[in-house]
């Protein structure tokens, strides 16, 4: 297989002209780091003495962050609460150069994932969340339409938090506008993603929809059937240590993972789909973008927490 970088001459300038609209569920990723040197007398749990705190973009915000880290432009459309976490998240997003379009629901608690870290490993995660009101979600529809002309690709990042209740309508409008449409899916109902360009489930997510498969031949048959039923251009199955497989009209294309030490898988799927969207927006085909997206996923698992891959790392 030819090197997509050489074949398509993907320069920094080419990526800087690419623009991806990210729509979906955002969250604030909080990390509390501490020292663990004793067990609580109240219960058989470690006592963590917090020494450092950190906050990062999470969910769809991390996807958009991955796009701009590669050197492309990204807009982020989402719904958040009107609380401390949402304002902190907005500041983080704007600080990375992402164009933020935050709809605010005063009844919504902005999703926060708080991870407690001790001895270089995650000890505990606390989630704070609820579901946005339909009226607030509907109000973002006009904003979505106004943003479409300025982007070559639209990426829907579904974390199942309720922010993509109107995704079917948005996909239809993006399709009519001739955009590349990428979906990071959630749940067992993939019919809501009908007519997207590509969906990127992992093995667990795919199994919820098509059931188990006997072998690679059975997997290919089921994925092709799903692709045709939903009118998708492709299904991209991410397979962790087994790499990833693209199922499209040409058949099946598999790329193996690049061997490296896995430090943290948090956000790896975000990096894969963000890289794919960026390269499609820059003019590559799905098959040309696949090896680079796979490489990006392999690089990011060597970093801690929600992270991103730079242009220099990807094209080293």
Feature names for model-found ranges:
Residues 15, 148-149, 193-194:
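A short, aliphatic-rich alpha-helical micro-motif
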Residues 2-6, 138, 179-185:
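Short gly/ser/thr-rich secondary-structure transition/capping motifs
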Residues 233-234, 258-315:
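Conserved post-catalytic alpha-helical subdomain immediately downstream of the catalytic base
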Residues 11, 19-20, 28-153, 308-316:
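Conserved N-terminal subdomain of the carbohydrate kinase-like
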Residues 26, 159, 271:
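Active-site metal-binding loops of divalent metal-dependent hydrolases
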Residues 153, 161-253:
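Conserved phosphate/ATP/ADP-binding segment of small-molecule kinases
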Residues 67, 76, 114, 154-157, ...:
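Buried hydrophobic positions in well-ordered alpha/beta secondary-structure cores of metabolic enzymes
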